[in-house]
Amino acid sequence: MADAAVELPGRLAILPFRNKVLLPGAIVRIRCTNPSSVKLVEQELWQREEKGLIGVLPVHDSEAAGSLLSPGVGSDSGEGGSKAPGGSAGESTKQDTKNGKETIHWHSRGVAARALHLSRGVEKPSGRVTYIVVLEGLCRFSVQELSARGSYHVARVSRLDMTKTELEHAEQDPDLIALSRQFKATAMELISVLEQKQKTVGRTKVLLETVPVYRLADIFVASFEIGFEEQLSMLDSVDLKVRLSKATELVDRHLQSILVAEKITQKVEGQLSKSQKEFLLRQQMRAIKEELGDNDDDEDDVAALERKMQNAGMPANIWKHAQRELRRLRKMQPQQPGYSSSRTYLELLAELPWQKVSEERELDLRAAKESLDRDHYGLTKVKQRIIEYLAVRKLKPDARGPVLCFVGPPGVGKTSLASSIAKALNRKFIRISLGGVKDEADIRGHRRTYIGSMPGRLIDGLKRVSVSNPVMLLDEIDKTGSDVRGDPASALLEVLDPEQNKTFNDHYLNVPFDLSKVIFVATANRMQPIPPPLLDRMEVIELPGYTPEEKLKIAMKHLIPRVLEQHGLSSTYLQIPEAMVRLIIERYTREAGVRNLERNLAALARAAAVKVAEQDSALRLGKEIQPITTTLLDSRLADGGEVEMEVIPMGQDISNTYENPSPMIVDEAMLEKVLGPPRFDDSEAADRVASPGVSVGLVWTSFGGEVQFVEATAMVGKGDLHLTGQLGDVIKESAQLALTWVRARAADLNLSPTSDINLLESRDIHIHFPAGAVPKDGPSAGVTLVTSLVSLFSHRKVRADTAMTGEMTLRGLVLPVGGVKDKVLAAHRYGIKRVILPERNMKDLAEVPAPILSGLEILLVKRIEEVLDHAFEGGCPLRPHSKL
C-alpha cells in the first residue's frame, strides 16, 4: 500500500513507462530487457535490495496530455540538467536525446516505487540478462530537475502527496467527508454487481472497509481499463477532493457499462428464435430420457455424422453411395457385428478432403531460394532443380510436374528438401514411410470384407492432413519388397501416373479418389532395387555426399545450435571450436551425410549438460524482498520498449534461474574422454598395404562412397581360386577375369620367365574383401583385383597413397563406372592422395568440388597397363614385345 509516512529521498533513479501510469497503491510486474532499464534495476534495486526506491515516470508518444518536461543530458550532479516547468501543468517542452534522433516527452509528475520481488534471468542462447520486478507505487512526486547517470536518468524530486499531519487535518473537511461517502457507496454498488459473477471480490470488500479512502481512489482506478489521458489526469490530481471526484466518476462509469452489458444479454436471451427454443426443449427431453434409461444417443450421433457428410463436399456419385450406406446403418442396431465397420467407413468418407485444398500463395522464387540456402548447405544442382520446378509451378499452376525422386546416402537432406518444397508452396506436408512394406494393401488398402480392414497409407495420410493437395513424401521407396501378398511397387505405378491417379481406387474406400492434386516426392538410397517401370515415372535427382568442408559449415551453422538447444544449453555453457569439429569429422566419422557427426556433437552436449546440472555453485537468483500484501494487481501490458508489464496470477511463484558458469570449451582431451580414442587414422591405408597382394579400391554403397581393400594370398594347392567377403555374382566374375588376364600376361609383366610357365602350378589363390558382413557386388573392382594379383605374384607393394576404380575387359581395356563423385570424396576422407579413374569418367569430375580436386592427383587411364604403371612405386615395366 502507499505509505504517507514513507521518507522520499531528494534524488530518484527514473524508470520510464511508455504510455502507462503507475498509481500509488497499485502493483505491477515488469520484465526489463532494455539495457538502460537492466542497468537501473541492477544498481538501484538488485544491489540495494529492500532499501532501494526508484521513480516511475510516464513517457508520452505525443504532447497531447499532461504536463511535460525534457530530459537534460548532464551528470548526476545536475550539470546540464533541465529544470522542470515550475509547477505549470499546461506548459510543455521537448528536446532530442543524446543521439539527436528521438524526442522523448517526459511527464513532470511520477510515482515513487519500491520492489516487492526481484528475479534475474539469462536468456538462451544470447546470454542477455533480464530482470522481472514487482513494483508497488508509494507516493506522488514532482520532477524539479532531470539528468543522466550513465545509461539511465535520475531526477531531483519533491513530494506532492500530503503528509500524515496534513491528511489528519483534511479528513475533518465536510466536503471531503461527503465525497468519501459517495465514493464508497458507488464502489460498494460495483462490488455487489461483481459478486454475482466473480468469487474473489470478497477481499476487495474488506479493502473498502479498512483502507483509507484517499488510497482506495488510486487502487480502484488502477484496476480499471481506462485511457492514458485519464490515467495521467488521475496522477496529476494531487488535491484529495479532485481525486475522489474523478475516482467516483470512473467507478460509476465502470458500473454503468456492466449494467448495460447485462441488460443487453438479458434482452438477447429473451428473444430466442423458435429453432433455439426447440433446441432447448430437445435438450431437456434428452435429459429426461437419460433419467428413464431410454437414451437415443446413437441416433443423434448418426444425425451428426450425416451433417458432417453433407459438409464434406463429396462428388454426386460418391454422395449417392454414401447415402445408401447411411440408410443401411440406420436400419442396424449398434449391437450388430457390421454396425461398427459401417460407421467407421462413413466417418472416413466424411473426413476425407474431397474439395478442401491448401491455398497456395504467390510463389516468390527469391524467397524460396533464400529458404533453401538457409536450410541446406551446398547441394547447388539439387536446389537449382527445385527452383526450376517451382518456376514452372508459378507460370502454370495446374501443370502436372514430374515426380521428383531424391537418391543419395542417408543423412544428406533428402527428407528436409521435400519439406522445403511444401514450405515454398504453402502446402501441408505428409511423410509416408515405405521401408519394409511388402503388402500391396499398405498402398491400396484392405477390402472391407476382412476383419480389421483399414484404408491404405495414402488415403489415411490425406485424412490426417485434411487437404487434397499436400506434398506427399514417399520415403525409402527402394526398400519395398514383394511376397505372396502382392507387390507394393506395382501398386505405386497407378499412384505416380498422372493419367491414372485421377481415379485412384483404394480397396477399402471402394470409390475413386482424385490424387492428381497431390505433389509426390520420393526418396531412395539406391536406384537399383527400384523396378524400371516405377523408376521411369520419376525424375531422379542424385544427392552426393558432403565434403569435409561442407560438413564443417553445416555443423557450425546448423548442427551445433540445434544440438545445444535440444540439450538446454547455449554458447555460454558449451563452445565447440571449428578445429574440434574438424577433428570429429576426420577421426570419428567417415560418412556421406552428417548424422554420425550430429550424434557425436550430441554426446559432447550431454557431457556438458551433466556438468552444468551438477554445478555446486548453482544458486537461486530470485530474491523475495517483501511479501505482497495487496490483492488488486495491474494486469495491463506496457507497449513501449523500456519495460513489459505482465499479469501476476494470485499465488503463483516467479520462476528462478541459475548462475551462468564459465563456458566449457571442447578440446582434444575432452574429445577422447567423451567419444573415446579416434576410430580412424590417416595411416590406415599405409598400414594395410604394407605387404604385397593388397590394393586399395573405391566402391559405391547406399551410404555413399567407401574405400575397399582387396587382399590376395597364395598357398600350396591345385590351382583353385577362393573368394570370400560375401560377394555377388558380378564381382566373382570380375575376379575370374582378373586372374585370367594376369595369367595370360604373366610373361609380359615379368611374373614368369616364359609364357609356358603356369603361375598357379601347385598353388591356390585366395582373394578376400574385408568387412565380410557387408554384401559386395559390381564390376568396378576389376582394376583393383588385377593390381592385387600382380602385387602378389611380383612381390611388390602397391603404393599406399593410391586408390583406384574401374571395370576391365579381357583385352585390358578400362571401362567407365558410376558414383565417381562419391568415390573421390571417400578417397579424400581416407587421406588418399592419388586416384586412378577410367578416362571416360573425366566428365564426372566436374561434379567434384574444386577444393577436393586440388588436394588429389587424378590419374586417367585407358588400359590396365597404365593402372599398373601408376599403382607401383617406379612403375610396372612391360616387356617391349608385349602385344594386346
Curated annotation (Swiss-Prot):
A cellular-component GO term for this protein: peroxisomal matrix
Binding site for ATP: G408, P409, P410, G411, V412, G413, K414, T415
Alphabetized Pfam families for the sequence: AAA, Lon_C, Lon_lid, LON_substr_bdg
Residues spanned by motif Microbody targeting signal: 882-884
Location of the active site: S780, K823
Biased composition (Gly residues): 75-89
GO biological process: lateral root development; protein import into peroxisome matrix, docking; protein processing; protein quality control for misfolded or incompletely synthesized proteins; protein targeting to peroxisome
Subcellular location: Peroxisome matrix
Main subcellular location: other
Enzyme class: hydrolase
SMART domains registered for this protein in UniProt: AAA, LON
Domain of life per record: Eukaryota
InterPro entries recorded: AAA+_ATPase (IPR003593), ATPase_AAA_core (IPR003959), Lon_bac/euk-typ (IPR004815), Lon_lid (IPR054594), Lon_proteolytic (IPR008269), Lon_Prtase (IPR027065), Lon_prtase_N (IPR003111), Lon_prtase_N_sf (IPR046336)
SUPFAM superfamilies named in the record: P-loop containing nucleoside triphosphate hydrolases (SSF52540), PUA domain-like (SSF88697), Ribosomal protein S5 domain 2-like (SSF54211)
Lon N-terminal domain segment(s): 12-255
Domain Lon proteolytic: 689-874
GO molecular function, one term: ATP hydrolysis activity
EC number: 3.4.21.53
Transmembrane segments: none
UniProt cross-references to CDD domains, sorted A to Z: RecA-like_Lon
Record's keyword terms, sorted: ATP-binding, Hydrolase, Nucleotide-binding, Peroxisome, Protease, Serine protease
PANTHER family for the chain: ATP DEPENDENT LON PROTEASE FAMILY MEMBER
Function, as annotated: ATP-dependent serine protease that mediates the selective degradation of misfolded and unassembled polypeptides in the peroxisomal matrix. Necessary for type 2 peroxisome targeting signal (PTS2)-containing protein processing and facilitates peroxisome matrix protein import.
Family per record: Belongs to the peptidase S16 family.
Name this protein carries in UniProt: Lon protease homolog 2, peroxisomal
Organism listed in the record: Oryza sativa subsp. japonica
